[in-house]
């Protein structure tokens, strides 16, 4: 399988040439150096297998010399990708087609058998497989809740706030007739599993130099149905610290009993995060 994983057979990293198209970006990543491309690691779990590959690109005559942040020497560029193979479930999950009036993450699907249909789109929304214990009741406990695990690297100062925020989603699910649809646990310090195992939905603690958002996905779905199989959420340290700083500076939150929850009581960690 080396010819598949150690090449661009699964995912094209280099941009294709567009005849007549504008060359707005002078940076060229170069050619794939197959002799330097390698597996970083291979991880096997009960329901998924991950191949992490480091692709190396060589460009002896670059026209752009990079930057002091992401790339110091453009003559050699490393790109790391993870290829994941996930076991698909066999169940009675019923896909739900997208309604363009409501925003969802979707799997785009085109019905190739509808030759006369001007809009042959059958996009499926991404959603969890939540089932009622008592389907005949308007409101019922769920058979299997969505369980989120707070990663054990998360500072203790923030764990209760994170748990409270996630569990607040139960109010929305109750409106849909699903009781206790979301559960939150803390990953034990001696856990024999890690976030790479798709069976665990993990709220991961991270510290990036310039994150695009305070929290972001991804989730993993069955492309045939749209069922969400698992998800990890990256929680950025800088978002929490900035939130507390802005709150102290601008006194954004009210101390009223019915007002938003305030986190000014939190003591920020003094550890330097790299």
Protein language model features and the residues they cover:
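Auxiliary tRNA-acceptor-end handling modules of aminoacyl-tRNA synthetases
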Residues: 1-154, 172, 181, 187-266
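Single conserved hydrophobic/aromatic residue that forms the stacking wall/gate
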Residues: 265-274
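Zn2+-dependent metallopeptidase catalytic core
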Residues: 153-181
């Amino acid at each position: 399988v080396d010819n598949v994983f150690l090449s661009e057979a699964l995912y094209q990293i280099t941009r294709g040439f567009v005849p007549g198209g504008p060359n707005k970006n002078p940076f060229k990543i170069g050619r794939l150096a197959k002799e330097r491309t390698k597996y970083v690691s291979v991880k096997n779990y009960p329901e998924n297998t991950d191949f992490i590959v480091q692709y190396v690109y060589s460009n002896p005559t670059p026209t752009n010399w990079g930057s002091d942040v992401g790339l110091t020497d453009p003559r050699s560029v490393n790109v790391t990708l993870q290829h994941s193979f996930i076991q698909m479930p066999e169940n009675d999950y019923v896909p739900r087609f997208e309604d363009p009036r409501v925003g969802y993450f979707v799997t785009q699907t085109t019905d190739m058998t509808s030759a006369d249909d001007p809009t042959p789109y059958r996009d499926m929304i991404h959603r969890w497989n939540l089932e009622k214990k008592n389907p005949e009741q308007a409101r019922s406990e769920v058979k299997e809740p969505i369980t989120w695990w707070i990663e054990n690297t998360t500072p203790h100062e923030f764990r209760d706030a994170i748990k409270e925020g996630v569990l607040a989603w139960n109010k929305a699910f109750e409106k849909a007739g699903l009781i206790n649809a979301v559960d939150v646990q803390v990953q034990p310090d001696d856990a024999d599993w890690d976030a790479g195992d798709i069976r665990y939905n993990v709220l991961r603690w991270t510290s990036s130099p310039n994150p695009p958002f305070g929290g972001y996905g991804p989730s993993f779905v069955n492309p045939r149905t749209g069922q969400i199989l698992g998800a990890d959420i990256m929680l950025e340290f800088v978002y929490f610290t900035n939130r507390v700083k802005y709150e102290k500076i601008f006194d954004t939150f009210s101390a009223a009993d019915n007002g938003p929850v305030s986190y000014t009581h939190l003591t920020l960690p003094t550890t330097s995060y790299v």
